[in-house]
Amino acid sequence: MFQQNKHHQQQQQQQQQQGVVQSGVASATVNNPSESIVAGNIYECSLHGILSTPSSTFIQRAKGMMRCEHPVSYKEMVFKSTVQSAGPSWAEGSILPSEIHVRYEKNTVYVRYVGVPQIKDNINAMIRNVVDIKSSETFFIYLENLGYVKDYEYFVDGYQYSTYNLSLFLVNHRRVLNDGTKGELLNKHSMVELQCLSGEEGFVAAAEYLNTYAEYLYPFVELIKFDHRLLTAENSNTPTTNVNVVGGYNR
């Protein structure tokens, strides 16, 4: 009986610890794009870096830290809204996002909404509201009817390493050629992102969780809190180059 109670207490403690970092996970399958979607406020907390050391050394460290590894390969398309108002007449009162990401992965369509990054001075991580939904090819017609057009696209290839609620991505970005195939690399070095999901009450714990793992990856890669406001300030004083610094792709 004592062993059972002890085991039960350990399970409760583990669930509580995980709940601090990830207070909820939202997922939904959309067969009809016009169906209403119900999802909680899920936030993606992340740190970013560029791998300048040999990838073999980094991968060895990542495998030692994480529980599982699997390849990542998909095509990301970003659609931009051309509607200046809140939306079409039949969607009066709704607020349409300025951008919607559509991901092709293993012949499956995933729709991803990514909110504007939140920069909180007392939290050492980037925070974004995210919604991921599995959809179908008909979603492209739905996007067109809503007034969205494709802005840019790129390929992503690499690996994802996971443990508990944490994911580590080591990826490269490639251009999309006119025939839809993969082109040359957009960056000399691989991009690294460490991320976990969190509810609104768990930002501080999630950031501490990320930075603890980031210390284990240093000096192989330095993962930092990316502040997009610095790019905006720099771009206001310099000519536009049409290059997205984070993703490394041309529009």
UniProtKB/Swiss-Prot annotation:
One of its GO terms (molecular function) is transcription coregulator activity. InterPro entries: Mediator_Med18. Transmembrane segments: none annotated. It comes from the Eukaryota. It is found in: Nucleus. One of its GO terms (cellular component) is core mediator complex. Keywords: Activator, Nucleus, Transcription, Transcription regulation. It holds the Pfam family Med18. Gene3D superfamilies: Hypothetical Protein Pfu-838710-001 (2.40.320.10). Its main location: nucleus. One of its GO terms (biological process) is positive regulation of transcription initiation by RNA polymerase II. Component of the Mediator complex, a coactivator involved in the regulated transcription of nearly all RNA polymerase II-dependent genes. Mediator functions as a bridge to convey information from gene-specific regulatory proteins to the basal RNA polymerase II transcription machinery. Mediator is recruited to promoters by direct interactions with regulatory proteins and serves as a scaffold for the assembly of a functional preinitiation complex with RNA polymerase II and the general transcription factors. Component of the Mediator complex. Belongs to the Mediator complex subunit 18 family. This is Putative mediator of RNA polymerase II transcription subunit 18. It comes from Dictyostelium discoideum (Social amoeba).
